[in-house]
């Protein structure tokens, strides 16, 4: 049975996970990533590795400033079976975790709780 999946991720670590979902028999409903950020002296706008990868695959990306009521309603309408989170970089609000018939799975880059935090790969 194919699952209906929403993916939430941002850095390089998340790209192979997203690619695995795309290449599976499951149905990818949406991709969420952090919004583009200004960096460097020229204040160039940089998109996340997940956004760049999705753009290459011609898949639309959602990058809201906040996971608010509008996003919750959008997700509810998609009716996913599962939401896969891989280093998204935002805290998922508790009310999202209660969306009916939707489960969440978090893929972490290191062993928890020993290597928790913002830079688990570097610390491990």
Where are these regions (language model features)?
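One-carbon transfer enzymes
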Residues: 1-124
């Amino acid at each position: 049975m194919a699952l209906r999946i929403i993916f939430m991720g941002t850095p390089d670590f998340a790209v192979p996970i997203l690619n695995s979902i795309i290449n599976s028999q499951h149905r990818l409903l949406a991709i969420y990533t952090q919004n583009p950020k200004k960096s460097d002296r020229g204040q160039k706008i940089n998109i996340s590795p997940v956004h760049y990868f999705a753009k290459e695959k011609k898949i639309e990306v959602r990058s809201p400033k906040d996971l608010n009521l509008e996003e919750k309603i959008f997700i509810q309408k998609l009716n996913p079976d599962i939401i896969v989170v891989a280093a998204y970089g935002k805290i998922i609000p508790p009310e999202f975790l209660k969306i009916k018939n939707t489960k969440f799975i978090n893929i972490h880059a290191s062993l928890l709780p020993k290597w928790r935090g913002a830079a688990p790969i570097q610390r491990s």
